[in-house]
A protein has these predicted regions:
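Extracytoplasmic
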Residues: 1-86
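Extracellular beta-rich ligand/substrate-recognition surface
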Residues: 30-38, 103, 157-162
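Signature of short aromatic-glycine-proline-rich micro-motifs recurring in repeat-based ectodomains
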Residues: 35-39, 108, 173
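Hydrophobic beta-strand segments of well-ordered beta-sheets in folded domains
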Residues: 54-56, 88-89, 121-123, 179
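Right-handed parallel beta-helix/beta-solenoid
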Residues: 74-110
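N-terminal extracellular ligand-recognition/capping segment immediately after the signal peptide
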Residues: 106, 110-163
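Parallel beta-helix/beta-solenoid
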Residues: 168-180
Length: 180
């Protein structure tokens, strides 16, 4: 912004092409599969307000040979991070779990959901990127899973196995709220 570096974005073409055959989506081309292009969406906080007439420039700083096409950028004012609600159980309370470390936080989330099942019913996922390497079963009705806000908490499922990530509502579970 105005010739000052305010953020760095990591872009990847890893999921740029998918191949559809019947009801299935594949990462590799094959007979009868139709190629489909998708976009890598990334977001970041700039740490400052962008004002009218500011100049925004995106510059490639890596030395790879990849070309990048930027379709568009979208700017919006990000709300401040949401603080931990009173009485909430935080995933960060689990044995030193912390965001942005590349470590699987599945056990921390499962622990927090089990702890919140009776006393508070709220699980808090603080700001940062939290990685989950497997499918997370929701076992308790009435839970609220609360992040620090869409610009602050990132939930990333890292399994490369089909059906290996995401949330699954186990039998009889309902009334779960996931927010921010």
């Amino acid at each position: 912004v105005n010739n000052e570096t305010v953020a760095t974005l990591d872009l990847s073409s890893e999921t740029a092409w998918q191949y559809v055959g019947g009801d299935h989506v594949y990462d590799e081309p094959g007979d009868g599969r139709k190629a489909r292009f998708r976009f890598d969406e990334v977001h970041t906080l700039l740490g400052r307000q962008v004002e009218k007439d500011d100049h925004i420039q995106i510059v490639k700083v890596g030395d790879d040979q990849n070309a990048y096409g930027i379709d568009f950028i979208e700017l919006e004012q990000a709300a401040p991070a949401i603080e931990r609600p009173e009485g909430a159980v935080s995933v960060a309370d689990y044995q030193g779990a912390k965001p942005d470390d590349g470590v699987d936080d599945s056990d921390a989330l499962i622990w927090a959901m089990n702890q919140a099942a009776a006393p508070s019913k709220t699980v808090y996922i603080p700001a940062g990127t939290w990685e989950f390497g497997r499918k997370i079963g929701l076992d308790h009705s009435g839970l609220t899973i609360q992040g620090a806000g869409m610009w602050h908490t990132n939930v990333r499922f890292t399994s490369d196995q089909a059906g290996g990530g995401g949330f699954v509502f186990n039998r009889g579970v309902g009334g779960v709220t996931m927010t921010d």
